[in-house]
Amino acid sequence: MVTVQMTLDRMKHTKCQDNSARQNLFSSLRQHVSHLEMADNTAQLSCDLPDLDAALSGGVRAGYPHLVCGHLHDGAATGFVLALLDKMIMQNPDAVFIWCAAPYAGLQGQLSARGIAAHGISPAHFIFIDEQHPMQLMAAFEQALQTKSVTAVIAEYGVMHQRPDLWQRWIRRFRRAARTSGAFGLLLGADAPAAGLETKWHITSSCYQQAPESSQWDEWPGLWDVELVSARGGRPYRNMLVWDRISRRFRHLPAQHQNSVPARHIYQSAASPAFSAQPVSA
């Protein structure tokens, strides 16, 4: 903080007409504040892949809200969030998650205990909050995000992002709440503005052009087109990633499947022999 105060003192004594010097000082101040914020990080969740972790400046940061977007009727975004939660359990076997959703908010139906167990996660880690009213749902997410004993809080926000004024107001509140508890905040839904959020992801299902070799996988693992749209202090990233439920790790798509395509192209071109593989989602 001494450096920040020294920079502010220098700005006071810089002549108004010397715009170049003032701009340099502002730039120096912004960089120093950014370094302080990054140093304030208490926990990061590695995504197993050096290139993705580098784009995230180390990993997914705890104590901040993150946005995970997907297409309607595509469970990939939900599957990606569950994969992140599974990795949190690897770090903390006693992890507790609060999942806030309205019946109409889900991208692909409602999450069930049986579905969570099928993903390889014990439902005992979850507390579910069902709330019909969108504003009450956001309030529940904020309150849960302030709870220090919670590892992560997830909210399926439905149509809340369609009100930009309310959306930005809630994002500011979520950011303060997450900083209070140090928990991961995960907002799950359709494409929404990312201002004020730590990261924005866009996750869609993809399809194998041929079945994975049995010697490599006993089943077809989730294959996702993962796009890191924005990351504070990081950079954009996009790649086809496989979620291996056995090792509980993200992996790059093997070379023999590099021609795999987004699942939506399969649906749009179902009659074409070039798109014959079955889609794999969450």
What does each of the following model-derived ranges do?
Residues 72-75, 90-93, 103, 117-118, ...:
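Localized chelating/binding microdomains
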